[in-house]
Amino acid sequence: MLSKTFLLSSAVLWARVANAAFGITDNGSSYTIDANSPNPLKFTVNKSSCDITSIVYYGSEFQYSGKGSHIGSGLGSATVSATQSGDYIKVTCDTSSLTHYFVVHNGDPIIHMATYITAEPDIGELRFIARLNSNLLPNEEPFGDVSTTSGGSAIEGSDVFLVNGETRSKFYSSERFIDDHRHCISGSAHRVCMILNQYESSSGGPFFRDINSNNGGDYNALYWYMNSGHVQTESFRTGLHGPYSMYFSRSGTPSTNIDTSFFASLGIKGYVAANGRGTVTGKASGADSSMDWVVHWYNNDAQYWTYTASDGSFTSPAMKPGTYTMKYYQGEFPVAETTVTVSAGSSTTKNISGSVKTGTTIFKIGEWDGQPTGFRNADKQLRMHPSDSRMDSWSSTYTVGSSSLSDFPMAVFKSVNNPVTIKFTATSAQTGAATLRIGTTLSFAGGRPQATINSYTGPAPSAPTNLNSRGVTRGAYRGLGEVYDVSVPAGTIVTGENTITISVISGSSGDAFLSPNVVFDCIELFQ
């Protein structure tokens, strides 16, 4: 005889299967979309605001009840319609300058999305935020609780918190665009992932990073930031952002290889199908082979990138037609730049070559990789505030030949560890004229380096471009990458021991880690 437990569980499963029917239900003030997926997914979209107000997956309500999931902080009002065509459902939300789409394919537990804009939203950023049940989905992936701020007290602005003695922020969930194909939140029985295969209308390039998730207690937020003012290095792009996909699963992590080519038949504004695109193939050469090589294409309308193969060969993603700047990086440091024109339906061949050129090196601290790799606290800075007790001391003296790379701080702050001191020993052959090259990756509050070599003080550089954004305290190190050359007159360097100090200067001031600062890439003295 079958047990009551078995009969009950079978009845629940049967109910889930029986209720599954791909389609749209018009509730008067909202639409409910049934994906007809094996693990049932239904979600409800408000007709007047475009907010998602309910997401029921495998019988559990995932949507936070206090506020919806939506573009920006909500569209406020929109014209919302829903249509079904065969195995596809499209919900369209229209405003005067933005159209947002939810798309569902019959049988898939995925909410595909795309966002078309003709102007940047007034709030100065474009994002989708899913506010999900933090009891069912408390975890953040792949970086864990570094961005879980629930129960914390604010220590900087309203976005950096102290939680159980650790600094945390939603910004510490970030990953470089070139590496961020998927980020997730999860619980013991469920996982929801944002799958990102298209950044062409975003801004900032391959090394830009932004908020991915944040468990703030009331809900766990899963984001896709298409653009923002968070250390933004270029103008915003309009047009179609996406497709991007919110994937629901019970176990395992979904693949990032999702085919969204069906968007071509759905009347999505701004969508360019594969046959309307072209590619660039070629070979990169000349850069430091110990580093990853990246090729990057961009213009006012789109951006693309790819890692090269080990031999330097590459093929671009499928690109919209146009003329692009083509840039070549070792790590994140640019070594060459050219232009290339892409035509629909064809592949263009374009090689690129470049390297870092200096001179006869007296000493070099770090590598020209466009990152603070290996410097003190660089291994921690992405995931915690510089004031965190787990950080090493920011002050130190670096002695060439005996200090470890990790003895050199990744950043100099005007009110914390200013100046940074370097000691080195020179031979008589090294006392002639020289160049001290100071590579930086990011500046804050007008900070720029001024060097003193023994008794000679180099000129004060002009202020760099102001990105108007906190950086290093929010887990960023990538800005415009200014490089400063200091001409050192002959006789300044002496035989024997020499001392260099690098001070951050600025007409601005600030407390502690919000004082003017620069992040270092590499320091090289050469003749």
Curated annotation (Swiss-Prot):
Keywords: Carbohydrate metabolism, Cell wall biogenesis/degradation, Disulfide bond, Glycoprotein, Lyase, Polysaccharide degradation, Secreted, Signal. One of its GO terms (biological process) is cell wall organization. One of its GO terms (cellular component) is extracellular region. It catalyses: Endotype eliminative cleavage of L-alpha-rhamnopyranosyl-(1->4)-alpha-D-galactopyranosyluronic acid bonds of rhamnogalacturonan I domains in ramified hairy regions of pectin leaving L-rhamnopyranose at the reducing end and 4-deoxy-4,5-unsaturated D-galactopyranosyluronic acid at the non-reducing end. Gene3D superfamilies: 2.70.98.10, Carboxypeptidase-like, regulatory domain (2.60.40.1120), Galactose-binding domain-like (2.60.120.260). Disulfide bonds join 50-93, 184-193. GO terms for molecular function: carbohydrate binding; carbon-oxygen lyase activity, acting on polysaccharides; rhamnogalacturonan endolyase activity. InterPro entries: Carb-bd-like_fold, Gal_mutarotase_sf_dom, Galactose-bd-like_sf, GH-type_carb-bd, RG-lyase_II, RG-lyase_III, Rhamnogalacturonase_B, RhgB_N. Its EC number is 4.2.2.23. Pectinolytic enzymes consist of four classes of enzymes: pectin lyase, polygalacturonase, pectin methylesterase and rhamnogalacturonase. Degrades the rhamnogalacturonan I (RG-I) backbone of pectin. Active against linseed rhamnogalacturonan. This is Rhamnogalacturonate lyase A. It comes from Emericella nidulans (strain FGSC A4 / ATCC 38163 / CBS 112.46 / NRRL 194 / M139) (Aspergillus nidulans). The lineage of its organism: Eukaryota, Fungi, Dikarya, Ascomycota, Pezizomycotina. The gene is rglA.
